[in-house]
Amino acid sequence: MNTSITARELFDLQRDRLSLRWIAGQQGEHRQIDSGDTRARRPSLAGYLNTIYPNKVQILGTEELTWLDSLEPNKRKETIEKIIQFQPLTLVISKNQSCPEDMRTAADNSQIPLWVSPKRGHELLNHLSYHLARILAPRATLHGVFMEIYSIGVLITGEAGSGKSELALELLSRGHRLVADDAPEFTQIAPDVLDGTCPEILQDLLEVRGLGVLNVRHMFGDTAIKKNKYLRLIVHLTKPITEPTPSGYERLTGDSGTRHVLDLDVPLITLPVMPGRNLAVLTEAATRLHILRTKGIDPATMFIARHSNLLERRPP
């Protein structure tokens, strides 16, 4: 899913935090950058003035403006034209420095937004890079119920009617927290991190068959809702299996695997839904087991090692 942001949207988002003033190029407010564009061409999202590998947001600090002032008139004009030619999303001048008139004119003529901020260059760089990276990060919407269980993000998935919402309701009654029902949105904010949030229209809501839509915040209190959580585990509910001993399920290690989400392989544990099974307890146990495995503790491996040692000690 591609996301985009316009110069106007970025300015409105950061105006108060960075004390931005828009001094030229107001006609370029609809200029935009999208995630597909950044992945295809791989420019830096924000950085100090660079006329060789241009950034999407060019920051002009004291050294950059001093360097421009030191150029001969023809070279200065050529450099400013080159900056404009790269078509950045915006130019930002730091520390409330005076903007050169020729740069202001060039920004107006080419409709390149030109902003001024009292913040220092590295503050602008860090802040804009961070927020642009989050806004334009790859994202996906998955079907399921996303919850915080024992302080980690767990996505409960399964076909319609498998009992996801009823399980979520039981987990809520046991003190765990809801992030999103039905359509949680996941954003890859780092190479190994998927951040899950709830769409605004679904905020605080949980749909349970027979009961309809429930407001979790009103029923369980503010502490039952979590704004966002990193996805660490997927628990998948399967349809009932009638065989007494289901083939394909490892008795020692359980049914564990991974699911590919965006660029990450997320650990997955499959639980068969059968009459009489307490899925809430099983989901809690699956979460605890995952936490142990991340610490290098695997009960199945320990048992296999004990069994092997016992066989080795037995006389022939």
Curated annotation (Swiss-Prot):
Provide the alphabetized UniProt keywords. Answer: ATP-binding, Kinase, Magnesium, Metal-binding, Multifunctional enzyme, Nucleotide-binding, Serine/threonine-protein kinase, Transferase
Which residues take part in binding Mg(2+)? S165, E207
- Taxonomically, which superkingdom? Bacteria
Q: Which GO terms describe its molecular function?
A: ATP binding; magnesium ion binding; phosphorelay sensor kinase activity; protein serine/threonine kinase activity; protein serine/threonine/tyrosine kinase activity
Matching entries from Pfam families are given as: Hpr_kinase_C, Hpr_kinase_N
Give the GO biological process terms.
regulation of carbohydrate metabolic process
Needed cofactors, names only, are: Mg(2+)
Q: What does this protein do?
A: Catalyzes the ATP- as well as the pyrophosphate-dependent phosphorylation of a specific serine residue in HPr, a phosphocarrier protein of the phosphoenolpyruvate-dependent sugar phosphotransferase system (PTS). HprK/P also catalyzes the pyrophosphate-producing, inorganic phosphate-dependent dephosphorylation (phosphorolysis) of seryl-phosphorylated HPr (P-Ser-HPr).
- The name under which this protein is listed is HPr kinase/phosphorylase
Q: Which source organism?
A: Xylella fastidiosa (strain Temecula1 / ATCC 700964)
